[in-house]
Amino acid sequence: GLPRPGDVSLAHRGVLFLDEAPEFSAGVLDCLRQPLESGVVTIDRVGGRASYPAAFQLVLAANPCPCGKAGGRGLECTCTSLQRRRYFSRLSGPLLDRVDIQVEVGAVSAADLASTGHGESSVEVARRVLRARRAAERRLAGTPWRLNAEVPGSYLRGPDGGLSAPLSRRLMTALERGDLSLRGVDRVLRLAWTLADLE
């Protein structure tokens, strides 16, 4: 029959969280590239072809190695360097080029868990996000976009994107040296606008 929506399209306008991402096959992970780029997933089957909306935030989580003990406090990792390389090689460069923020999180100790320090409440974070979205909407008024994630790179890099000449030169130098891909330049600009909106 006709292809039916899967997790990617069910995550439309939400978050697709892949825990232990390197445990997924490289083929499955690379299939995420097209919907991340276009916001649409197209499925071809013998019974027909179907396209579904798939504009989602992708969150990937991974252990530091296959056994999960590398970098841990008092834990002995049993993985070889080759095993670690193979483990992370499933997360291809083109896929990671579509991941805006990458963060390494260290092991949590018992003392960290027992700590009574308080961060921001969910309500406070929600208020900050709402203010940032309103700032983006004001800045993007008169354009077809409401969110920084929706703005195409050509606009971000163009005269209306608000990019100063010195910053533009720095980004183009990073692009020419191979430190950033064109997607990476756009990612930096989107993230910069988001951080500015959060201020």
Located regions from the model:
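Conserved alpha-helical scaffold flanking the Walker A/P-loop in AAA+ ATPase domains
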Residues: G1-L16, R49
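Basic, amphipathic alpha-helical bundle interface domains used for macromolecular binding and assembly
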Residues: L2, A26-E199
